[in-house]
Amino acid sequence: MKKYKLSILLASAVLGGVGATYLSAEVNEVSAAEVKTEVVTPATTTDKNEGTPAGATTSAAQVTAPKEVKNIGEVQGESHESPLVGKEVVINNVVVTKTDKTGFYVQDKVSDNNPRTSDAVYVASAEKVESGDLLKVQGTVKEGYMEEYSVRPGQTFKKPAGSLTVTQIINATITKLGKTDLPKALNISEKMPKDIVDNTPTKYNPETEALDYWESLEGMRVEVTKPKVTGPQYKGDIYVLPGDYKGQKLNNIGGVNLRPGVQNTEVLPITVGNSFVAKAKDYFNENITGVVTYKNKTYKIDPIDPNALKGLLQDGGLTREVSKIYPSEDKLTIASYNIENFSANNNGHDETPEEKVDKIANSFIKEVHSPDIITLIEVQDNNGGVNDGTVDGVKSGEKLAQRIKSLGGPDYKYTEIAPVDGKDGGKPGANIRVAYLYNPKRVTLIGKEKGGSEEAARFVNGHLEKNPARIDPKSVHFEKVRKSLAAEFEFKGERIVVIANHLKSKLGDDAIYGSNQPSVENTKAKRIEEAKILNAFIKEGLRQNPNLKFVLTVDFNDFEFSDSVKTIVGNELVNLMAEHEQGDRYSYFYRGSNQSLDNILISKNIKDKVVFSPVHINASFMEEHGRASDHDPVVVQIDFSKPAAPVSPEVKPEQGSTSNKEDKKDNLISQDLGEVATDANNDVPKSKTKEVTSAKNVLPKTGLDTSSSLVFAGISAMMAFFLGRKKRNN
């Protein structure tokens, strides 16, 4: 397999026209000048007793005598690229282990016992063979992409940028030697390197790096012990852990959470097809055997008999949740929900069907219990993906509000600021944005003029000048990105600023198992700059009004431990997801791991008055189970039944900090949801409740502070004044 220098060869129509087409989101179209075309002809077959037929296929490249190799390991080599690329080889005594529509896998009947080289290779051929056939294979060695064989006649193959290649034999002549037993399948998890994908790209280390370990098994028969499913089937793949997995601690649904600085290399993708229905916590009651392949920028296991898998899958019993946070008269409930490209357009592919509208509306009523304020992420304009210059999304938002009401929920009001056409990223023509639903019987959107699409939000005298308003919409850091939307609400006399966010996506990051190693988060720097803008906005609001309350909601497109989220938090906020129970700390599922793209941040002046929880109704499930979006909603509730203590302005020291433990009773984030508190930095369980300590210097008291000393001084002055008047009157 080729790791860095990616050559391209175009398969002929003989091998095309079948299978699901895959085109990467990051692709470079290959021009005719860049493509080396090889006509892959049907392999000719001989019987070992009949000799070579007169019609045996040859090519211009077969001028010199083919190299007879001892085993497939010589073809694969101890690297990601075959040392024999472009050479014609002859391989004897190889066994067919699996067939597909464009070829088959063969493996050495007798291993070379070198764990650093694969014993198997893919043969691109239309020849009819069966599993267990013993063959002699003669053909040309190629490094290519499995996606090539999904290209239909008349289509142009586009190289998947950043993808590895697969070692193949093309232009093959096949000689059948008989039948034999299949090689024993290796337990793929037994020697899988933990955490590290590839830290030394110039060296080949299958013993310590997962990328190289997978390469050393390319095409080989492997086995997974009674796999446990970690998440829903997506694009024909499921991700599993072996039933005897003994690695990191599992989360509450038997999966693994993403962790800082490492990858969950032990999670294994298995190809099952788009019709396969599975969710987190399901499991197989038998071992699964398959061959190792590579497609869509990841290694995966292609089962020997995919049709048998449905009969082996057992229901793990996971059901969609209902929030443990219920409405209360003196408590403000705020939910945030990425509703995945929602619009009023229900006509056409990739638009919003009525069934989805019902599912999302019902989730707000039945599973999230009709929150007072809802921040909506991924609202599209009124006609969705129709690229006609429409930017207004009021019909989209009001359609959801009306559906909630018709199904028995509150009569929500909708507010947004439409973006400039084509300026906020997302699906072309859809003009994605963040927006709000709010219950006017519970909260008031402070009545001020609404900000413009390119007008930056400002604080004047400690409150938003315009409401709602977009935060720094002209910043270069928010180009082609959804602009954060600030809105100031009043609840029972309390003012609170809610900020809905949808930061730069991760599209453009290197694939974890791609050709660029170590993989780089190319989008990270932009999110950090966006985070700095948000943190500065919070600081200014608190500078003007230290008692102003803030809630920042999803989607940050980053994790609770990420630099970008930590930058937003700064010294002014608390990340409730980072404080949440470790086993429940997720809202999204991607390539085998549970993760927390959806965080809720609050200002420290309400940290002792809140409860928080993600509500797991989507990320672990498929549409067949009721899934309405790819994200779970997250909910925070603030208890305003007793006033919060006044807060003085604070600044974060540039060098060092002073940590003073405060009274534990005043420092707990309420967790009546049965969570186990963990250290936010290293996830080490500490106690049943988590103490939040102050790590900041406090400025001198100002006139805004209502400290007891000032109150006492004021009372003393008033008493002196009235006593003086009494004496004069007497």
Task: Tell me the role of every PLM-derived stretch.
Residues 16, 669, 684-727:
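A cross-kingdom C-terminal cell-surface attachment/processing module
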Residues 54, 62, 303-646:
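Divalent cation-coordinating acidic motifs and surrounding scaffolds
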Residues 16-19, 139, 372-379:
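Acidic beta-strand-to-loop metal/phosphate-binding motif
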Residues 52-333, 337, 341-347, 351-370, ...:
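Extended non-catalytic accessory segments flanking core domains
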